[in-house]
Design a protein with these regions (language model features):
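Positively charged, low-complexity/disordered segments
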Residues: 434-439
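The two-metal-ion catalytic cores of nucleic-acid processing enzymes
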Residues: 1-391, 395-396, 400-432
Length: 439
């Protein structure tokens, strides 16, 4: 099979049967789908683990088992570790849950790292990286070489086209009469009527294919628009491929394929849905709609992405490069999640075992210390319910502001490399808790 060498950028990374689909933007401007064989893994550690039980579990879960070692996160010592390599990316989560049930969460390491991030750490191909790849005509990557660093300032990248999909009017569409759908690309607005049914869906697909945007921005796309479109398409049995159809190097050049591709899903261009969730943060119950992502094309719900609203596409590109999280997922996460991903990547490169669950207890604090210092002294949690005459103190970006103005971070408090500096306010033991500002 003829080999091909290409230069370009890693547009997106997603799991496929037996490996990862790498959507690649060539220097010529083509977006093609490549395939990289890859099997993610997780580790089990602990003196109580029995080899016979581990091998039996690996056989049941169809995982490859190997003995190795790693650096313990807490002690810094090198300890034995057992590596479970799963058959494919989709089986990582189920296998980890089985291992947690069988051996306990304290035995698991490197188990909460997404396949995409594991792939980036193993190969160096991170989202939006510039790379040279050597692949077969069917898209199977044989070798790859990264040509830049995620830390490069103002790293060059291709221009990205954007289209907007929304309903007419303002406000949440679920709270008013259903209005026509608007598709805006290249400054031109097209209106589509829901009552046209199957023709409405086919026209939407035609508009998306003709504009071929790299980024499809929606308003309320995750919690209302895309679920409604998918439900309508399912009821009318009309395909709704809003993502890109996988095209291999052979497809682009016009050459015949020599064998079936392993790229993508059984339904090319399909919309991939996730899980919705609710959580409590500082006394507020927050709902996060299920993410709806596209293959080979980015989908960002402007109403479900704090980062997109604050930084736009350039900010998402930068954070995706730095964190190793694919852009569609980083758009729906917090800056803290991206920072954690950067820390995990650093640990993996250093051979440090990342605990599955946090198990390092905090230093003891008395009741008085907790009142003064815990959560900055803010210990009041509002009673759930409807209230009137409510006042709110909004500390926008409080923690980043403290880090920026006063250089406060885990690396600068009680560090061993500097003399004690300014005492941290309100901490009782001021001799031992200091901020070192010389970093």
């Amino acid at each position: 099979m003829p080999r091909r060498e290409m230069n370009g950028w890693v547009f997106d990374i997603a799991g496929s049967p037996g490996g990862m689909t790498v959507w690649f933007r060539t220097a010529a401007g083509e977006t093609i789908a490549l395939f990289a064989p890859f099997r993610p893994s997780f580790l089990l550690v602990g003196n109580r683990l029995k080899e016979a039980a581990l091998r039996a579990a690996a056989a049941r879960w169809k995982c490859d088992l190997a003995r190795g070692e790693g650096i313990d996160f807490l002690s810094g010592r090198t300890i034995p570790a057992w590596s479970f390599t799963v058959p494919g990316p989709a089986l990582l989560g189920p296998s980890v849950r089985k291992a947690e049930k069988a051996f306990g969460p304290e035995a698991l390491c490197n188990a909460d790292i997404a396949p995409e991030q594991q792939f980036s750490c193993a190969t160096g191909l991170y989202p939006l990286s510039r790379a040279a790849v050597d692949c077969d005509g069917d898209g199977t990557i044989r070798s790859a070489r990264v040509l830049d660093s995620p830390w490069d300032v103002d790293a060059p990248h291709p221009s990205f086209s954007i289209a907007l999909l929304r309903t007419e009017g303002t406000g949440h569409p679920a709270h008013r009469r259903v209005r026509p759908l608007e598709f805006i690309a290249d400054g031109v607005t097209q209106s589509l009527l829901w009552e046209n049914g199957a023709d409405f869906l086919r026209e939407l697909v035609r508009l998306v294919e003709r504009a071929d945007p790299d980024l499809l921005v929606t308003e309320y796309g995750d919690d209302w628009l895309l679920p409604r479109l998918l439900a309508l398409a399912d009821r009318l049995r009309v395909p709704l491929p809003l993502g890109r159809i996988p095209r291999t190097p052979d497809d682009v050049s016009g050459a015949a394929r020599n064998r079936a591709t392993r790229i993508g899903s059984s339904v090319p261009g399909r919309v991939r849905g996730g899980r919705e969730r609710s959580f409590v943060s500082y006394g507020r119950v927050i709902f996060r709609a299920a993410p709806h992502t596209l293959a080979g094309r980015w989908h960002v719900d402007a109403r479900n992405s704090f980062l997109f609203g604050e930084t736009g596409l350039p900010g998402l590109v930068e954070l995706s490069r730095l964190s190793g999280i694919p852009l569609q997922r980083v758009a729906r996460t917090s800056p803290g999640t991206a920072i954690s991903a950067m820390q995990v990547a650093t640990a993996l490169k250093g051979g440090i075992l990342v605990p599955y669950k946090k198990r390092e207890p905090e230093a003891f604090k008395s009741g008085v210390d907790l009142v003064v210092t815990d959560k900055g002294g803010l210990t009041y949690l509002p009673r759930p319910g409807a209230h009137e005459n409510v006042g709110e103190l909004d500390f926008a970006s409080m923690y980043p502001s403290l880090m920026d103005r006063y250089n406060i971070s885990p690396e600068t408090v009680n560090c061993a490399c500097c003399r004690p500096g300014l005492p941290v306010p309100s901490i009782r033991d001021r001799k031992s808790t200091h901020l070192n500002s010389s970093h």
